[in-house]
Amino acid sequence: MVAPNDAHLQYFGRWDKSNAQEYQCAQGAVYIKANFTGTSIKAKLRDPNDKWRVSIDGGAFQKIKPRGNETVLAENLKPGTHKLLFVRSTEGYMGTTQFRGFELDDGARLEAPDPLKTRRLEFVGDSITAGAKNDGELKGENYNDIEDNDQAYGPKVSRMLDA
């Protein structure tokens, strides 16, 4: 088990780290980066309503909805070192996520994190800034299914400027 306060984990955005065993977040587009060995990784989350996206080794994002005590983020990977990017997609009104760490394969471990970028940007706004309805058409009650904070203009501009 990798605890939330492991020094090899990198957190971005607003995280409440007052409890070393359970970090919390409530805003969209917060994320975690980690480099790990092994063939799989699971997240220990308590989060009934939110949606997340995961990218392994810079690949395409996969949509994730937390399930139970452990949510599979990736499995059947080639043995070796991998890069994880784990991003919350839904806005703050959906509630708070409790993150309790990651589960890795037996014998697997976290590796040293990548160097932090020197530029930082901050965007303040409303649901447009948060990526509301930017991932599909609103049809009834699918609001959260068509929201992706990581594809809002703030994160996109940050990536374009290498911030």
Explain the meaning of each model-derived region.
Residues 1-124, 128-149:
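N-terminal secretory targeting modules
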Residues 141, 146, 156, 161-162:
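Phosphate-binding active sites in nucleotide-utilizing proteins
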